[in-house]
Amino acid sequence: MPTIQQLVRKGRKNIKKKSKSMALNCCPQRKGVCTRVYTTTPKKPNSAMRKVARVRLTNGKEVNAYIPGEGHNLQEHSIVLIRGGRVKDLPGVRYHIIRGALDTAGVKDRKKARSKYGAKCSKKINKINKK
């Protein structure tokens, strides 16, 4: 506990909030190139083959990014757009690839939450909404 005299001399240091997505450098999204596309298994209670890509960003940093949705067209040297947002059961994966932007295709036959997966409006959905 500092004395009043010590506080007058030095003052208190402000604690700076550390960002959870450091590689974005305060940008909402970043462009990058896939260096490796692979699948990994999640942490203990869960079981699956999660699709992940290693991405080299335009600022020179390399990060692991999750590929959401069913099926994807990514391969090495694909240009992708990434956003922040971790995957809780994959250690070290703190970013998501944005579907439907740049080289990443949207999820095919997606009916709900289409904007999150870059899916275009199908004619069937259009007819239902008009009625």
UniProtKB/Swiss-Prot annotation:
PTM sites of type 3-methylthioaspartic acid: 89
One GO CC term, this protein: small ribosomal subunit
Pfam families cross-referenced by the UniProt entry: Ribosom_S12_S23
GO biological process, one term: translation
Superkingdom, taxonomy of origin: Bacteria
Keyword Magnesium belongs to the record: no
InterPro entries named among the record's database cross-references: NA-bd_OB-fold, Ribosomal_uS12, Ribosomal_uS12_bac
Alphabetized Gene3D superfamilies for the sequence: Nucleic acid-binding proteins
Key words of the record: Methylation, Ribonucleoprotein, Ribosomal protein, RNA-binding, rRNA-binding, tRNA-binding
GO terms, molecular function: rRNA binding; structural constituent of ribosome; tRNA binding
Cysteine disulfide partners in this protein: none
Family, similarity comment: Belongs to the universal ribosomal protein uS12 family.
Function comment: With S4 and S5 plays an important role in translational accuracy. Interacts with and stabilizes bases of the 16S rRNA that are involved in tRNA selection in the A site and with the mRNA backbone. Located at the interface of the 30S and 50S subunits, it traverses the body of the 30S subunit contacting proteins on the other side and probably holding the rRNA structure together. The combined cluster of proteins S8, S12 and S17 appears to hold together the shoulder and platform of the 30S subunit.
Protein name: Small ribosomal subunit protein uS12
Source species of the chain: Karelsulcia muelleri (strain GWSS)
Gene: rpsL
